[in-house]
């Protein structure tokens, strides 16, 4: 059995991950971790996820459950994830990282850790989104410089980073296919007298409202026609199942920094 730990286990995504782990053949939740000051520490992780008792108590200290798992799934916050990364690197534990909002410098720390442990890091673990990334690469190469490119995304009111990591990843894929540097061509929102659109730019627009799980659209607009590639998530379970799939795939893999394109064989 693949022994899986979930950090941030008392949160919305954490509970969904617990459910996904317990549903996956060959996988089992053997550790669940949350903040040390959480009033839920000691509670049964299965009961937190409305699955019934599974005999795995919620811990407030990753080090105390280090012997209980093979791979850690982390969808938390950059500062938390980096602390967990340092621990897992030292302990020789594999990691699945779905946290977004890392700076370029912080991402480099993931690259360095990948020299010692196997890691799957992705802005989005949905199989559909990763298929969209493949389609976006093809669309950008075919349509080339003949189109204006805009990326729109919508998420629930609680999401703290913008644009979403998925939207940025989509932008990176498109920019790379066109030989552009996203940092130089990205335009984040528009206001006032912006002037005519620079055809080399890639625009981003963000919506935060209600309980939207995650909508992403990339628009390729030319004179006379438009191509839109859209993905809409209706449940967090799609991300959780992808993360568990990645955790199973990582079993026996050499140290390295992988992504969902590797997991799905899309490279």
From Swiss-Prot:
GO cellular component terms attached to this protein's record: cytosol
Binding site for (S)-2,3,4,5-tetrahydrodipicolinate: 156, 165-166
Listed pathway(s): Amino-acid biosynthesis; L-lysine biosynthesis via DAP pathway; (S)-tetrahydrodipicolinate from L-aspartate: step 4/4
GO molecular function: 4-hydroxy-tetrahydrodipicolinate reductase; NAD binding; NADP binding; oxidoreductase activity, acting on CH or CH2 groups, NAD or NADP as acceptor
Location within or outside the cell: Cytoplasm
Entry-linked HAMAP family: DapB
Function (record text): Catalyzes the conversion of 4-hydroxy-tetrahydrodipicolinate (HTPA) to tetrahydrodipicolinate.
Name of this protein: 4-hydroxy-tetrahydrodipicolinate reductase
Gene that specifies this protein: dapB
